[in-house]
UniProtKB/Swiss-Prot annotation:
PANTHER family: RIBOSOME BIOGENESIS PROTEIN WDR12 (PTHR19855:SF11), WD40 REPEAT PROTEIN 12, 37 (PTHR19855). WD repeats lie at residues 105-142, 145-187, 194-233, 265-303, 305-344, 350-390, 394-425. GO terms for cellular component: nucleolus; nucleoplasm; preribosome, large subunit precursor. Residues 7-93 are annotated as: Ubiquitin-like (UBL) domain. Required for maturation of ribosomal RNAs and formation of the large ribosomal subunit. This is Ribosome biogenesis protein WDR12 homolog. The lineage of its organism: Eukaryota, Metazoa, Ecdysozoa, Arthropoda, Chelicerata. It comes from Ixodes scapularis (Black-legged tick). Keywords: Nucleus, Repeat, Ribosome biogenesis, rRNA processing, WD repeat.
Length: 425
């Protein structure tokens, strides 16, 4: 295509505040997204549809559902779209850049994080858990208890006191805790035993009744999340833990809890787990597979094959899709409902090291974050596979964990002993 190519384009938007006339415009092929944004603002000014404000909004543009990151001409050539056709450009307000809010210092690697209205829960390689005040960044509590590095943490219930959360560790256990926000007292109420190696990941069911753990022992285990449950847990898999007697209390300390269900099938460490429905769980593993499990029937439903070891996954309830972190620098988008078992919907390439963690936005079906050994956390739009929206720098060593459970805050934990908080506007 020549530099002087003229392209016929129509603009449309779902945001009525910024609508412009639905007429074709002749636009130079060399026009950039920034120049298109200026054009929309000029049209808005002409039609007086623009809000009464000095600052002009910046816009992003979509062609056939993909964000425009090149000139119009380059994009059409890349996508093999004939330049003679009328190009329909959807535009939307541009996502503002995240701003750094705080850096919370730990004494060792920060390997786990989960934020809620109750506060930020973090796990450390010095075997300790921490609860932080989200608004002020002050440490509420440092909690010893595990005998090995913390691998994952998750709030279970925060609506009513006391708050409940679960932690997993290299010490082969998961622990269920209760924390009183008013008195700042914390208690370990259940020690969950059954795994034979490091317990590397955890997720809580949507109704808060159960949680599921994945381990370096290749196993997936489902547990009751009720702190007061004293029922005998009969394993549906016929394993020995299911036949044990009721939970025991030793010297008044935390009771020992056994799993409700054990699921075997992975051939290597289970590195990520997510509830995808009340009775369904997705896992990823170092064995290069994603698997979907039916925890009601106690078996595997489907398997998606990857090409590299998976290090983490995140499931979006809004779009019902999974993003995965891998040991080959790429983030991948999967549809767990696919039947052929191999379809990767999209790959996102920008990191320069292993991608250690991913997390969907809680209130957007397009945005997610990733953390990598290259020290960066990145904000992505699923419609822009070639480049992230923004890089969030600040870590001085590899990023080990990320969290975007609160819409306002994107959080990363790193091997530089820091927990970084960025605000999403």
């Amino acid at each position: 295509m020549g530099e002087t190519a003229q392209i016929q384009a129509k603009f449309f938007t779902k945001d009525e505040r910024y609508s412009v006339p639905d007429t074709p415009f002749s636009i130079a092929g060399s026009t950039t997204p920034e120049q298109l944004s200026s054009l929309i603002n000029a049209l808005l000014k002409e039609s007086s549809a623009s809000p009464d404000q000095d600052e002009q909004p910046a816009f992003d543009f979509l062609i056939n559902g993909e964000l425009l990151r090149l000139t119009l001409e380059e994009h059409l050539e890349t996508k093999e779209i004939p330049q003679e056709t009328i190009v329909h450009l959807e535009y939307l307000e541009k996502c503002p850049p995240p701003s750094p809010v705080d850096s919370l210092i730990h004494d060792d690697w920060v390997s786990a994080v989960h934020a809620s209205e109750a506060g930020i829960l973090s796990g450390c390689y010095d075997n300790t858990l921490h609860i932080w005040d989200t608004a002020t960044g002050t440490r509420r509590l440092t909690i010893p208890g595990h005998l090995g590095p913390i691998k994952s943490v998750k709030w279970v219930a925060v609506a009513e006191p006391p708050c409940t959360f679960v932690s997993t560790s290299h010490d082969e256990t998961a622990m269920l805790w209760q924390w009183d926000r008013r008195t700042n007292a914390v208690e370990s109420v259940q020690v969950c035993r059954g795994h034979a190696r490091s317990v590397d990941c955890v997720d809580v069911s949507w109704n808060g009744a159960k949680f599921v753990t994945g381990s370096f022992d290749h196993m997936l285990k489902v547990w009751s999340a009720d702190p007061d449950s004293t029922d005998t847990d009969h394993g549906q898999d016929g394993s020995e833990e299911g036949s044990r007697k009721k939970q025991k209390t030793v010297d008044g300390k935390a009771k020992t809890r056994v799993p409700v269900l054990t699921l075997a099938g992975h051939h290597e460490a289970v590195t990520g787990v997510q509830w995808t429905d009340e009775g369904e769980v997705a896992t990823c593993s170092m064995d290069h597979t994603l698997r979907i499990w039916d925890v009601e029937l106690g078996g595997m439903k489907s398997q998606l094959a990857g090409s590299k070891a998976f290090l983490g996954i995140s499931y979006s309830r809004l779009n019902r899709q999974i993003v995965s972190a891998s040991s080959d620098r790429h983030v991948r988008l999967w549809d767990p409902r696919t039947k052929d078992g191999t379809i990767v919907k999209c790959s996102y390439t920008s990191h320069a090291g292993w991608v250690s963690a991913v997390h969907w936005a809680p209130n957007s079906d397009h945005q997610f974050i990733s953390g990598s050994y290259d020290t960066l956390m990145k904000l992505w739009d699923a419609r822009s596979p070639k480049a992230p929206l923004y890089d969030m720098s600040g870590h001085e060593d590899k990023v080990l964990a990320v969290d975007w459970s609160l819409g306002k805050y994107m959080i990363s934990g790193g091997a530089d002993n820091q927990l970084k908080i960025f605000e999403h506007k």
